[in-house]
Design a protein with these regions (language model features):
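Glycine-rich NAD(P)-binding loop of the Rossmann-fold in SDR/ketoreductase-type enzymes
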Residues: 15, 19-30, 59-62, 66, ...
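Conserved Rossmann-fold NAD(P)-dependent oxidoreductase catalytic core, especially the SDR/UDP-sugar
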Residues: 8, 29-63
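C-terminal amphipathic/interface module of NAD(P)-dependent oxidoreductases
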Residues: 174, 190-225
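Glycine-rich Rossmann NAD(P)(H)-binding loop
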Residues: 120-125, 150-158, 205
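NAD(P)-dependent short-chain dehydrogenase/reductase
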Residues: 77-126, 132-133
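Rossmann-fold scaffold of SDR-type NAD(P)-dependent oxidoreductases
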Residues: 1-4, 42, 151
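Mid/C-terminal beta-alpha module of Rossmann-like enzyme folds, strongest
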Residues: 135-137, 144-189, 194, 225
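NAD(P)H-binding glycine-rich loop region in Rossmannoid oxidoreductase-like domains
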Residues: 1-23
Length: 225
């Protein structure tokens, strides 16, 4: 069983913490219990970390800054109780969704289609990855019967500003407008500034390495992102 459903944004979890806990923690506990005798993969997040150091490994202690991160960290502990189960921490995933408004990359395209400018942080760092690469990695982990904790993310640490520039280069006809900003000045929930993930552990067991976003975009010029 692969469990990737969630209240999946910081803002949504912060505005409705009870729902976030029911979906992210309680539902995970229920599903993990139902899957007690079979392999179970739970999708977690780089936002279980506080972002003070970056390049986090699987052995680093979590320290979430907000309700979303807290619920993911709590759910991880439930899944870890069963040695047959697996936790996959990932980062920003890009691609296309059924609704067209699920991912960071889709938010950018929608803004540009509406001729709106976008303010992107130069001081917040993640390891973005194409969702198809995440799916490939998880499928390989399942087929190899890997259990425990794995970081599955892009091989390149980028700021949101850098990510936006890479994506904008693909959508020049939309006349992308990007301005730099600072996460430390953001008035909303606290933001972890550098949750980049060290992916050495998973790279050592995959048939092909996970690429960085720049590398992936160059190798897949016609793939929507």
């Amino acid at each position: 069983m692969i469990h990737c459903a969630a209240v999946s944004t910081v803002a949504a979890a912060q505005s409705n913490p009870d729902l976030a806990r029911r979906v992210n923690v309680d539902a995970t506990a229920l599903l993990a219990g139902l899957a007690a005798d079979i392999p179970f993969v739970f999708f977690s997040s780089d936002l279980v970390f506080d972002g003070r150091k970056g390049n986090y490994t699987e052995t680093d202690a979590v320290n979430p800054l907000h309700i979303y991160g807290e619920t993911k960290a709590a759910a991880e502990q439930i899944v870890f109780k069963n040695s047959r189960h697996t936790v996959v921490r990932t980062s920003l995933n890009g691609g296309t969704s059924r609704t067209g408004n699920r991912g960071f990359n889709e938010d950018l395209r929608l803004a540009w289609q509406a001729d709106r400018g976008v303010n992107l942080f130069t001081d917040e760092f993640r390891c973005p990855i194409f969702a198809g690469e995440t799916a490939r990695a998880v499928w390989e982990l399942v087929n190899q019967r890997r259990t425990g904790l794995f970081h599955v993310a892009g091989a390149e640490k980028l700021s949101r500003w850098q990510i936006g520039q890479l994506i904008a280069a693909r959508w020049l006809r939309l006349n992308p407008k990007i301005t730099p900003g600072l996460a430390k000045n953001f008035p909303g929930p606290p933001r972890a500034l550098d949750t980049s993930l060290n992916i050495t552990k998973v790279q050592n067991v995959l048939s092909a390495p996970l690429p960085g976003l720049g590398e992936w975009l160059a190798a897949n010029p016609n793939e929507p992102f």
